[in-house]
Amino acid sequence: MERQNNDGGYTFCQYTDSSAEDTYFAVRTLKILGVEPKQKASTIKFLKSLQHKDGSFDSIKVAYYVVKTLNELGAKLEKSPKEFILSLKNPYGGFGSLNVDVEVSSEIESTYYSIEVLKSLNECINPNEIISFILSLKNFDGSFGKQGYSKIASTYYALASLNLLGYNTKSLNKTIEWIRKCESPRGGFNSNPYGFDTYMVIEDCYFGVKALEILDEVCKYPLQTLSLISKFQNGNGGFRRSIFLGISTLECTYYAVSTVKTILRKI
């Protein structure tokens, strides 16, 4: 609650402006913890203010965070962003660019966000073209990623998108095998099978556990993973990205809390 501003939005760094991203992660985390968000009316007003008059947003990420958080709070946008979302379609059948910055976790991320927003708005989606696009990014080892570059983030977003579109993800046996290779006996997941446990980050633990959940699988080392996640926690109660150093963020805290809840459900 310390990270909520007077406008109802949230920020991971006190005394800075609220953002859609931090507000989404804060509200989602509170829901997992069974805590009712404060100043709900102000939060809804803040989120709605992020939509432009023509229905668009600054990015698909902002649209996703706004729509999903409003859903959590029992509210809706005044104007549908459908046209904005459809304007992001790429020639390959997905959404957004395949050439993404290093800060973006996956080239499939925009497609996943777009599907989620359209489904949240009960808009009709033609799944076949999008499914073909996602499967075109499937590598020989079962992972997903452009030009054969496998990442657990891309594999998670691919599975989550396919699942939303009604594709039988449980038929992807090689994908399950690849994710298992990312799993460490000491707990957690690496970005790929060749990663080092030393450089493990909290979001890859989240992507690994959640990807297995989509496939009706569970992590092999739940207690070790829970122990590892505890090492990401700072003294202020929040979680950081690395086990070594870093400030707490609402995003990392959500990844940690959500991952823990998923694991505990299966034990």
Language-model region placement:
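An alpha-helical repeat/solenoid feature that recognizes helix-turn-helix modules
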Residues: 12-37, 56-78, 96-126, 145-171, ...
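Long, well-ordered core segments of solenoidal/helical folds
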Residues: 1-9, 38-55, 76-96, 125-142, ...
